[in-house]
Amino acid sequence: MGEKITFKSYREMPLCAMSIADMTYNLTGSWRNVRPYYDFKVSPCRLGCPTAENIQRYIFLVTEGDYEQAWKAIIESNPMPSITGRVCFHPCMEKCTRKDFDQAINIPAIERSLGDMGLDNPKWMNKAKATHKEKIAVIGSGPAGLSCAFYLAQQGYPVTMFEADSALGGTLRWGIPEYRLPNNAVDRVIASILESGPITVKTGAVLGKDITLDKLEKEYAAVFIGVGLTKSRPMGIAGEEGQGVERGLEFLRKVNRGEKVNPGKSVVVVGGGNTAMDVARCARRSGSDVTVVYRRTMNEMPAIKDEIEEAEREGVQLHFLAAPTSIARSGKGPIKVTFQQMKLGAPDESGRRRPVPDGDKTFTMEVDTMFTAIGEEGDASPFEQVIDVDGKLIKTRSESGETSKPKIFAGGDIVTGAASVVEAVSAGRKAAERIGRLLTGASEPAAEEPRTISIENINTAYFTKTKRVLVPRIGAGEALKGHREIYTGFDDELLHREADRCFSCGVCNFCDNCWVFCPDVAVNRLADKYEFNLDYCKGCLVCVTECPRSAISTLEEGK
């Protein structure tokens, strides 16, 4: 091999055919018959979220280290991420595109981390002042009422909250055990909401006694009802009332109040929802042997899957296809509960197969306590003289919670029946937004059909398969010693590791692929976005192919 020759300048090079001019004179854009354009879609996770949180946005901001703006992105649609990050049934994860590649992003864990950061940094919260003279009344201080009050206050409306209990929170305080949702977290969220704007509170305000709907309607510009469901549904069987049988909701209320409970050595819980799981796990913490009896199978259980798995991990036994028919007592000792064996028949209105008796097959369980947790009921009687009701629920005319009276709105479980915390939060926000438009005369926002993507639109060549980062937790043995919170939350390293897994579906996250790969140098990289230089883009669509997240679409030239 010959000696290496180094040229200090092109002038030292021997004569050869070469070009030292640029090609800007050649407007290759004239060759184009299709043009690319940046086209941001709605990520599937956001479409799955009942509060429509901009999940892609706040996870991207986490990867950038901008926690304050990430928290503010959540607060736009959900004022209590510290709570929903702990107790939501996270349908967003079911929609997460990454689950079709490896495992869904742990969205609730990221949401919880940001929610806790927001509580630790109260200066992040916008402190709204009263800018409107119209006063709004909110009845109930559960998730729907708190959400409605927050978003009304953020618009500048003075809000008065009426709560029958001695403390705010509703189901957040009394219906969810501390090992899932610590009282301290509830207290901090409520304090944050009350400090966010012109909100005053009146506790011990009992409907029909201290306040009435017709009076509030006269005194306030608008009223929102978010009282939730307050009663356990009865089973309607012989012996249901009496010693040895207790409503699940009442038991949870005692536990959350810190009262001493002793359900006995053997306990059966009837039901398959989250309340049943909560009651069973609280009873285990009292030292009881617990069996949950459900009339359908595991597949039909309405409880959050994670809660079922946690209950089993803590030693709760599950017995399926059985329903209680009678309860017998002899003195003050254990009770005998007779169960009918069931089988699944045709689907009912919920889409689940209806349980029907399996002939004459029965069995008996002898237990110290039976807890009933077959659902909750509302009480619409305080409102039926003023607005239309539907049995034990309030009738509404839209997702915004409008009732038969134009100034009265309702939302949450008192409208839908038993649902979730996050759905109640969404109902409260939508009602607040509608009330604001009603009082200002603003028009309704135009409805747009959201465009989204699926795994087929993701260029997975740019991603490595990784496992979801799990939230650290205490062991089952340690958990049963008390009501300490089970999941301890992400630290900064785990938070970033999980956020970095996000595909950022349909939304540019400035990865530079289009800028790097464009053969015509027709992508201009600006401070906060990219632009196509259509004088030189010849429509080769390399940018579309190499975009990892389908944030670029195409349009036929001339259209």
For the regions a language model picked out, list residue spans one by one.
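Short internal alpha-helix immediately C-terminal to a glycine-rich phosphate-binding loop
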Residues: 114-128, 249-262, 267
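Beta1-alpha1 glycine-rich phosphate/pyrophosphate-binding loop at the start
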Residues: 11, 18-22, 26, 52-63, ...
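Ferredoxin-type iron-sulfur electron-transfer modules and their immediate structural context
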Residues: 1-135, 183, 225-241, 329-334, ...
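Generic enzyme active-site microenvironment
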Residues: 161, 410-411
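A Rossmann-like FAD-binding core segment of flavoenzymes
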Residues: 184-234, 246-263, 285-391
